[in-house]
């Protein structure tokens, strides 16, 4: 990802238009200049709003952070920190769908539907021909506090007390990754929105015993951790599996947004009386009958990668739009469910097993009663 304000292009220096767009977006939220005096600075007032004043801004947990708190004996969660941020979700709202080539964002997608035209009228191809499709996650800070009887999970744009972990900006595939075969026969990863009738891209475990239409346009599965690393390396050294810190960062954003550890809680698109999100992302595809799923396509991925684009989810989350799969049930009727989407990321949980870089869970006995978790230093070259 290129986050430099000035970059080289065809041997010439130019301003990075994407960084300028981000700056312009931020300037829209500045207060007007009425009553501003010489020497005034931009501060956050007691209500959590940007304002001009003479006092230096000192970020605190109350004015510059938001999070959740729960007791150690149960998961009874309350919101803590700046209530305005809980309503406006400034960090979560900076997750944006984009098309990117290697480490550079080519353009951001329409936030209300990625298949929709951009502001300049351009209709983006989402099949990988113009670049990979992903979600750009912004830089922010997060930390976990132990108060003795309670835990706290915080996020902020500031390392308030020096204990926050910096989450560098990164791009995550908009769904579990697909693969394609190059001319030299090697398989490489790519991220795109592929329709179910696109015969070029066979997903799942590519089994010849499964009808091709039940695998087309789906993520790649049925491979080992080493194979996944190999497919990433075949694409280039700029792409890796998601690492443990990034995975935790995404989970933290969702936990705090809904003030709920149960991502699968029932969908509720209404806000609370305080203007907060509630509920969860819904069950997604976790409620599939295992035997029926096995009979349908051998427990390969169910939802095509084009689904969010087709339903204009954009940068949003689960909205109740249903996914219908013809002739799925034993009586010939259709499967009807709705996939779990978080901020444009399709199947945020529960569809297939996920590899996470830098963490290994080792089962110590055959009954899986005791497991050890080993976390190594992040290896992603930020």
Language model segments and positions:
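Single conserved hydrophobic/aromatic residue that forms the stacking wall/gate
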Residues: 373-382
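Extracellular repetitive beta-rich solenoid segments
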Residues: 25-57
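Short linear proline/tyrosine/threonine-rich motifs used for host-factor recruitment
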Residues: 50-52, 78-80, 187-191
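Acidic glycine-/aspartate-rich tracts in secreted/extracellular proteins
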Residues: 46-48, 140-142, 177, 246, ...
């Amino acid at each position: 990802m290129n986050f430099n304000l000035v970059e080289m292009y065809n041997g010439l220096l130019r301003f990075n238009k994407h960084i300028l767009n981000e700056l312009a977006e931020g300037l829209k939220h500045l207060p007007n200049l009425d009553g501003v005096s010489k020497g005034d600075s931009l501060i956050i007032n007691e209500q959590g709003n940007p304002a001009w004043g003479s006092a230096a801004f000192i970020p605190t947990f109350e004015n510059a952070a938001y999070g959740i708190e729960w007791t150690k004996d149960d998961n009874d969660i309350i919101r803590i920190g700046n209530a305005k941020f809980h309503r406006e979700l400034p960090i979560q709202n900076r997750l944006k769908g984009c098309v990117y080539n290697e480490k550079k964002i080519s353009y951001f997608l329409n936030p209300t539907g990625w298949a929709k035209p951009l502001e300049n009228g351009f209709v983006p191809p989402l099949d990988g021909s113009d670049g990979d499709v992903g979600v750009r996650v912004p830089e922010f800070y997060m930390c976990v506090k132990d108060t003795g009887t309670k835990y706290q999970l915080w996020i902020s744009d500031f390392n308030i007390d020096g204990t926050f972990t910096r989450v560098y900006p990164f791009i995550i595939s908009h769904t579990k990754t697909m693969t394609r075969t190059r001319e030299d026969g090697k398989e490489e990863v790519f991220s795109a929105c592929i329709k179910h009738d696109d015969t070029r891209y066979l997903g799942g475990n590519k089994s010849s015993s499964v009808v091709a239409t039940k695998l087309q346009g789906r993520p790649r599965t049925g491979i080992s951790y080493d194979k996944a690393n190999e497919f990433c390396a075949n694409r280039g050294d700029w792409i890796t599996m998601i690492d443990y810190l990034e995975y935790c960062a995404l989970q933290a954003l969702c936990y705090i947004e809904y003030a709920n550890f149960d991502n699968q809680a029932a969908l509720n698109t209404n806000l609370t009386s305080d203007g907060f999100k509630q509920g969860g992302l819904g069950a997604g595809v976790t409620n599939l009958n295992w035997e029926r799923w096995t009979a349908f396509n051998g427990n390969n991925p169910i939802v095509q990668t084009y689904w969010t684009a087709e339903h204009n989810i954009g940068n949003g989350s689960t909205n109740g739009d249903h996914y219908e799969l013809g002739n799925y049930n034993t009586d010939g009727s259709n499967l009807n469910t709705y996939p779990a989407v978080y901020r444009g990321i399709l199947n945020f949980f529960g569809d297939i097993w996920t590899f996470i870089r830098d963490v290994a869970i080792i089962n110590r006995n055959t009954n899986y009663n005791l497991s050890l978790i080993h976390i190594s230093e992040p290896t992603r070259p930020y």
